[in-house]
Amino acid sequence: AEVKLGSDDGGLVFSPSSFTVAAGEKITFKNNAGFPHNIVFDEDEVPAGVNAEKISQPEYLNGAGETYEVTLTEKGTYKFYCEPHAGAGMKGEVTVN
């Protein structure tokens, strides 16, 4: 699954913001617009036993085309956000089944 950081028109969103993957399927977050974005999983909004810190990318992806890849193996719903733009609504969720 590929998730864009920033919409094609420059909006501060994850695109798609809600999606489903199979357990063990690789997710690629790709900076689409060249604004600094990061991917932080909410420690209170991941399946029990999952270390949110280990699957997050707190360092900024600054340039267009920069990517962060993560593979989630525990089934359930994971919520994530972009730290600098969470207030603007840059949040998302992935369901692993």
UniProtKB/Swiss-Prot annotation:
<keyword id="KW-0934">Plastid</keyword>
<comment type="function">
    <text>Participates in electron transfer between P700 and the cytochrome b6-f complex in photosystem I.</text>
</comment>
<keyword id="KW-0793">Thylakoid</keyword>
<feature type="binding site">
    <location>
        <position position="90"/>
    </location>
    <ligand>
        <name>Cu cation</name>
    </ligand>
</feature>
<dbReference type="InterPro" id="IPR001235">
    <property type="entry name" value="Copper_blue_Plastocyanin"/>
</dbReference>
<keyword id="KW-0249">Electron transport</keyword>
<dbReference type="Pfam" id="PF00127">
    <property type="entry name" value="Copper-bind"/>
</dbReference>
<feature type="binding site">
    <location>
        <position position="85"/>
    </location>
    <ligand>
        <name>Cu cation</name>
    </ligand>
</feature>
<keyword id="KW-0472">Membrane</keyword>
<dbReference type="GO" id="GO:0009543">
    <property type="term" value="C:chloroplast thylakoid lumen"/>
</dbReference>
<comment type="similarity">
    <text>Belongs to the plastocyanin family.</text>
</comment>
<keyword id="KW-0186">Copper</keyword>
<dbReference type="GO" id="GO:0046028">
    <property type="term" value="F:electron transporter, transferring electrons from cytochrome b6/f complex of photosystem II activity"/>
</dbReference>
<keyword id="KW-0479">Metal-binding</keyword>
<feature type="binding site">
    <location>
        <position position="82"/>
    </location>
    <ligand>
        <name>Cu cation</name>
    </ligand>
</feature>
<dbReference type="InterPro" id="IPR002387">
    <property type="entry name" value="Plastocyanin"/>
</dbReference>
<keyword id="KW-0813">Transport</keyword>
<protein>
    <recommendedName>
        <fullName>Plastocyanin A/B</fullName>
    </recommendedName>
</protein>
<feature type="domain" description="Plastocyanin-like">
    <location>
        <begin position="1"/>
        <end position="97"/>
    </location>
</feature>
<keyword id="KW-0150">Chloroplast</keyword>
<dbReference type="InterPro" id="IPR008972">
    <property type="entry name" value="Cupredoxin"/>
</dbReference>
<feature type="binding site">
    <location>
        <position position="37"/>
    </location>
    <ligand>
        <name>Cu cation</name>
    </ligand>
</feature>
<dbReference type="InterPro" id="IPR000923">
    <property type="entry name" value="BlueCu_1"/>
</dbReference>
<dbReference type="GO" id="GO:0005507">
    <property type="term" value="F:copper ion binding"/>
</dbReference>
<dbReference type="GO" id="GO:0009535">
    <property type="term" value="C:chloroplast thylakoid membrane"/>
</dbReference>
<dbReference type="InterPro" id="IPR028871">
    <property type="entry name" value="BlueCu_1_BS"/>
</dbReference>
